[in-house]
A protein has these predicted regions:
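Alpha-helical scaffold elements within enzyme catalytic domains, especially in hydrolases
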Residues: 18-21, 72, 107, 146
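Glycine-rich phosphate/pyrophosphate-binding loop and the adjoining helix
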Residues: 121-182
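Helix-loop-strand module that forms the ligand-binding subsite of alpha/beta enzymes
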Residues: 39-111
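N-terminal beta1-alpha1 ligand-phosphate binding loop
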Residues: 1-24
Length: 182
């Protein structure tokens, strides 16, 4: 389910397409059904044994469209559906997706669903315009493999490693300090 806000779905669409390709290539996956938040039908949700929520975070939290889906599903009878999440954020640190992940975990716990894990993507908007796309593709492939095997997964990726981020930040601040004391 591409459950993000309508204006933000364009940013996660490439991740969705790549995930769909990898899931379709798995022999174990016999039915891939991609839904959008606006075409979502809560009556069919629990016909699937696995569901992946895919969205970009808004203010480090789940978008309102995803929360609306959660609310609709609360009244439905449940089976033991496995829930996965692909969460993208515009911040450099993939850890900015942690709050969204915890909300999904808590919702799954309350609704007696099995949360199997997530792929958290930091600096998603930059990745789409850079050569780093292939790195993310490898993580999406690993994520799809875990889904195909019904395994738990906890992956995170960002365009910048901590080391590169710190080096770039230090370079910037050193330059700013030199400007100030000239």
């Amino acid at each position: 389910i591409s459950s993000g806000l309508k204006h933000a779905q364009d940013f996660v669409e490439p991740f969705l397409k790549r995930l769909e390709v990898y899931l379709n290539s798995k022999a174990d996956c016999d039915c891939i059904d991609v839904r959008r938040a606006e075409t979502f039908d809560e009556r069919t949700f629990f016909e699937y044994d696995q569901v992946v929520f895919l969205f970009s975070t808004a203010m480090n939290s789940i978008p309102s469209s995803t929360l609306e889906i959660f609310q609709k599903l609360e009244l439905q009878s449940k089976n033991h559906t496995e829930i996965y999440a692909l969460i993208a954020c515009d911040e450099y640190e993939a850890e900015k997706c942690n709050l969204s992940e915890r909300i999904i975990q808590k919702w799954c716990q309350r609704e007696d669903l099995k949360f199997q894990g997530s792929l958290k993507i930091g600096s998603a908007f930059f990745i789409m315009k850079s050569a780093s796309k292939f790195v993310v593709s490898n993580y999406i492939k690993d994520f799809a493999t875990a889904i195909g095997k019904h395994e738990s997964v906890d992956l995170k990726v960002s365009m910048l490693t901590d080391k590169i981020f710190m080096k770039t930040a230090n370079k910037y601040w050193n330059k700013e300090i030199r400007k100030k004391y000239k």
